[in-house]
Curated annotation (Swiss-Prot):
Transmembrane segments annotated in the record for this chain: 18-38, 88-108, 131-151, 172-192, 206-226, 256-276, 296-316, 328-348, 360-380
Class of the enzyme per the UniProt entry, highest EC level: translocase
Known EC number: 7.1.1.-
Localization per Swiss-Prot or TrEMBL: Cell membrane
Subunit composition and interactions: NDH-1 is composed of 14 different subunits. Subunits NuoA, H, J, K, L, M, N constitute the membrane sector of the complex.
Gene name per UniProt: nuoH
Primary localization class, coarse: membrane
Alphabetical list of HAMAP family matching this protein: NDH1_NuoH
Disulfide feature: none
Protein name per the record: NADH-quinone oxidoreductase subunit H
Sorted UniProt keywords: Cell membrane, Membrane, NAD, Quinone, Translocase, Transmembrane, Transmembrane helix, Ubiquinone
Protein's organism: Streptomyces avermitilis (strain ATCC 31267 / DSM 46492 / JCM 5070 / NBRC 14893 / NCIMB 12804 / NRRL 8165 / MA-4680)
The reaction(s) this protein catalyses: a quinone + NADH + 5 H(+)(in) = a quinol + NAD(+) + 4 H(+)(out)
Keyword Protease: no
Length: 454
């Protein structure tokens, strides 16, 4: 007889009672929502300071309730549905984009597995659940979120959202390859895909020190994955009006914005877990304070690291301009993927040497990391060198402006002139020709005037 699912061994998901699992799930949801509300206000404040402005200062103390006011405003706005839209897919797209953004936090550890805290008299770990393949789960969930953006662009029945959805699909596919290679190097060095085990393996040195190239690659790819500046091509208002969410309003638009900021928090939490020691206290504190990694303190260190990475997102938005789409694809396919593959091979080689008890493995890893960082900088320098050569090249004569090149007339842009319009030759003076021909004598006077009677 086939056993039921309830009879299977589900101990890998934890041994907490169902009500405690619900409490921890609600805590994870509340953590994401509070962090998002704070991050929106923090972003507007930081960008305002960069631009010598005040920023939000009306709702709540120091404008801290501005995000809540914006959310209520969006919920009370009129919800419009485009007539040409595929209504079922149009409504489901924001949900498909928002739900996967919340799911990845389930396997992120907020504290050590052996440091159980007491919740209503029950001892439990500071993590919703831990899986042996937790990082593969995060990759799978992150890949599902792209469907919401693509479906939103396709179902809107408009050109601009469709182009934004296609851009987002191509961008995320391009950058997930390099992200997967960065993850693989961490798996090779830690020997596990479990998030709690990866944090435990960083007890002496964080992976940002051992795997610096993987950290740089992941930082670049996480900005591309979240469609944030300077890689926010799917929603560039300069050429796509509003991008994939142009035709959305009210609560549906708010769900897309919520998904974007929740993704920022999620990728920052993943980066903290993989490269920054997770919940572990920073190096100076952990050396003289033994209790820094016990109790509720690990959650404080984790939140501080996540907030620093969120500030990095904000700093990028306030300082860097949006790159062109061809530059974005060139960076992903010609720089990040080759560097990540070479670095992964080097990490695998060093890991093999360490298993054979070679002493120079760490030295080779550091040297290889430095070499790849130099290669990455050389790639970026080549890009700027080509741009400077193009700027220094003598300007060619611009092609003549053709107002009908696109099939319909368009006005000239500044600096363009309309070509001269061909005119007919001026008409010659007409000669008076009588009906009988030029050789026929006319009955009238020679000057063409009629004779009078007197």
């Amino acid at each position: 007889m086939t056993p039921y699912l309830a009879a299977e061994d589900l101990s890998m998901f934890g041994r907490d009672p169902w009500w405690l699992v619900v409490v921890k799930a609600v805590f994870c949801f509340a953590f994401l929502m509070i962090t998002v509300l704070f991050s929106i206000v923090w972003e507007r404040k930081v960008v305002a300071w960069m631009q010598l402005r005040i920023g939000p200062n009306r709702h709540g103390p120091w404008g801290m309730l501005q995000s809540l006011a914006d959310g209520i405003k969006l919920m009370l706005k009129e919800d419009l549905i485009v007539k040409r839209a595929d209504k079922v897919v149009y409504v489901l797209a924001p949900i498909v984009a928002a739900i996967p953004a919340f799911m990845a936090i389930a396997v992120i550890p907020f504290g050590p597995a052996d440091n159980e805290i007491s919740i209503f008299g029950h001892r439990t770990a500071m993590q919703l659940t831990d899986l042996p393949i937790a990082m593969l789960y995060i990759l799978a969930v992150a890949s599902v979120g792209i469907y919401g953006i693509v479906l939103a662009g396709w179902s809107s029945g408009s050109t601009y959202p469709l182009l934004g959805g296609l851009r987002s699909c191509a961008q995320m596919i391009s950058y997930e390859i390099a992200m997967g290679a960065a993850f693989a190097s961490v798996f090779l060095y830690s020997g596990s895909m479990s998030t709690s085990t990866i944090v435990e393996q960083q007890h002496d040195r964080w992976y940002i020190v051992l795997l610096p190239v993987s950290f740089v690659i992941y930082i670049v790819t996480m900005v591309g994955e979240t469609n944030r500046a300077p890689f926010d091509m799917p929603e560039s208002e300069g050429d796509l009006v509003g991008g994939f969410n142009t035709e959305y309003s009210s609560i549906k638009f708010a769900m897309f914005m919520l998904a974007e900021y929740v993704n920022m928090v999620t990728v920052s939490a993943v980066s903290t877990t993989l490269f920054l020691g997770g919940w572990r206290a920073p190096w100076p504190i952990s050396t003289f304070w033994e209790g820094a990694n016990h109790g509720w303190w690990p959650m404080l260190w984790f939140v501080v690291k996540v907030q620093l990475l969120l500030f990095f997102f904000i700093w990028l938005r306030g300082t860097l301009p949006r790159v062109r789409y061809d530059q974005l694809m060139k960076l992903g396919w010609k720089v990040l993927i080759p560097v990540s593959v070479v670095w992964l091979m080097l990490v695998a080689t060093v890991r093999t040497l360490r298993n054979e008890n070679y002493d120079f493995a760490d030295i080779a890893l550091y040297v290889g990391g430095g070499v790849l960082v130099l290669l990455l900088l050389s790639f970026v320098a080549d890009m700027f060198r080509e741009k400077s050569k193009e700027a220094a090249a003598p300007a060619e004569e611009p092609a003549a402006f053709d107002p009908m090149a696109g099939g319909f007339p368009v006005p000239p842009l500044p600096g363009q002139t309309l070509p001269p319009v061909p005119r007919r030759r001026p008409r010659r003076d007409r000669e008076l020709i009588v009906s009988g021909g030029p050789d026929t004598a006319s009955d009238g006077p020679a000057n063409g005037k009629e004779a009078s009677d007197g």
